[in-house]
Design a protein with these regions (language model features):
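P-loop NTPase motor domains
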Residues: 1-24, 29, 73-85, 89-281, ...
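Short coil/loop residues immediately preceding or within conserved phosphate-binding loops
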Residues: 33
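Hydrophobic anchor at the beta1->P-loop junction of P-loop NTPases
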Residues: 38
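C-terminal regions of RecA-like/P-loop NTPase motor modules
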Residues: 41-42, 293-376
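Conserved lysine of the Walker
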Residues: 46
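Hydrophobic positions on the alpha1 helix immediately C-terminal to the Walker A/P-loop
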Residues: 49
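A short beta-strand-to-loop transition that corresponds to the Sensor-1 phosphate-sensing loop
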Residues: 72, 286-290, 313-315
Length: 376
């Protein structure tokens, strides 16, 4: 290892340099591109690392906002301890968020039906299959969106936002046959058994720490749920930047490969990944399936272009990680033999071995661990 140090003014602690013993103090906002990837085998400590970062950032930056996509219900104890909001998403969940919620921006003056057109078209592609979307469908969807957002615009944005159920009704009420065909495809998500995203928002989405728990989400609803969450997060990121340009937004995608398996969600995510920096937002992908990411063009671009990468213990994917980041043989061995909480941080051009063991007799450890028998 070459001796390198990270000591960013105003940063947070990521542990100790395994070579020098000095503290590693870093801040992703200081990088040109502060998006991050955290990669490790199961049990390597990636969940603990990410939760510690969230905890420190939340306490350090009191106006920052946080969104966590949680497929395994691992983040709820931390979120609840900090007074955040856990949004449980499933077919029969009592909590709802409306992906058609809209906040008007006086600076851009973009009307809601224009802002939501891309999302709704992607939603229809997801439900109907991209090959079944016709050339004129976008115009029909635009007409329906303009219709359902008209009361909101006429009220100067004081009326309730429309829902997917309103969109379904608007399409069904249009006279042409094709609109009714699109409405029929949407019906199960508007009034049927999959209407989880067709309700007005009934949770506190103004909370600065929100966790989307999708553990109980069925496979049939999952693609629509992923798109709806990404749309909601994108809208929130832009709204946060307008309301307070100096306050960063942090977005965490655990088991990010679940999003990347679906082409529409992957494309939506990659677009967000590239433009988040413009809105003072920082995305983090967390995965134990490095090889799956390396064989996915979108995921590979995200891995290769993230300036902040945390590599914890690696086994079967070690050679792929070594090749991607140009690791030396000592660095390779360090990752192979790493204990939970040990690894290598790539920050900009620096590659630093670190260790960050957490005392097991603390409330913080019990709050952050996912090991059976150790949780509070």
């Amino acid at each position: 290892f070459n001796t390198q140090e990270i000591l960013t003014p105003g940063g947070i602690c990521y542990g100790r340099n395994a070579v020098t013993g000095n503290l590693i103090i870093g801040l992703r906002t200081s990088l040109v591109n502060g998006n991050a990837m955290v990669v490790a085998t199961s049990g390597g400590g990636k969940s603990m690392f990410v939760k510690l970062e969230i905890l420190m950032l939340y306490l350090r930056f009191t106006k920052a906002r946080f969104y966590v996509v949680d497929p395994e219900n691992e983040y709820a104890p931390l979120v609840q301890e900090l007074g955040g909001e856990v949004v449980n998403i499933s077919v029969d969940s009592a909590t709802h968020f409306n992906p058609l919620d809209f906040k008007y921006d006086k600076a851009t003056k973009i009307p809601p039906h224009v802002a939501k057109a891309e999302f709704v078209l992607s939603l229809c592609e997801q439900i109907m299959g991209k090959e079944h979307i016709l050339a004129g469908d976008k115009s029909l969807i635009d007409d329906a969106l303009e219709n359902i957002y008209k009361p909101l615009m006429e009220s100067h944005y004081t009326a309730p936002c429309p829902t997917i159920k309103d969109l379904w009704m608007a399409l069904n009420n249009q006279r042409d046959k094709r609109s009714k065909e699109i409405a029929l495809a949407l019906r199960i998500f508007a009034t049927g058994s999959m209407q989880a995203f067709a309700q007005p928002t009934n949770v506190d989405m103004s909370n600065r720490l929100i966790c989307f728990n999708i553990q109980s989400l069925g496979e049939q609803l999952k693609p629509v749920a992923m798109l709806s969450m990404l749309e909601y997060i994108n809208t929130a990121v832009m709204s946060n930047e307008r309301n307070d340009p100096k306050a960063a937004t942090w977005v965490y995608f655990d088991e990010i490969y679940l999003l990347l398996r679906d082409s529409l969600s992957a494309n939506f995510l990659y677009t967000s990944w590239k433009r988040f920096r413009k809105y003072n937002a920082y995305a983090t992908g967390i995965t134990q399936n490095v090889q799956d990411c390396l064989t996915n063009d979108t995921a590979y671009a995200m891995l290769a272009n993230s300036e902040f990468v945390v590599m914890l213990r690696q086994t079967k994917d070690i050679d792929s990680v070594v090749e991607l980041y140009g690791l030396s043989e000592p660095q390779r061995k360090y990752l192979l033999l790493a204990q939970p909480g040990e690894g290598i941080i790539k920050m900009g051009n620096s590659l630093i071995p670190f260790n960050n063991p957490q005392p097991k007799d603390t409330k913080t450890y019990k709050l952050l661990t996912t090991k059976p028998g150790e949780m509070e």
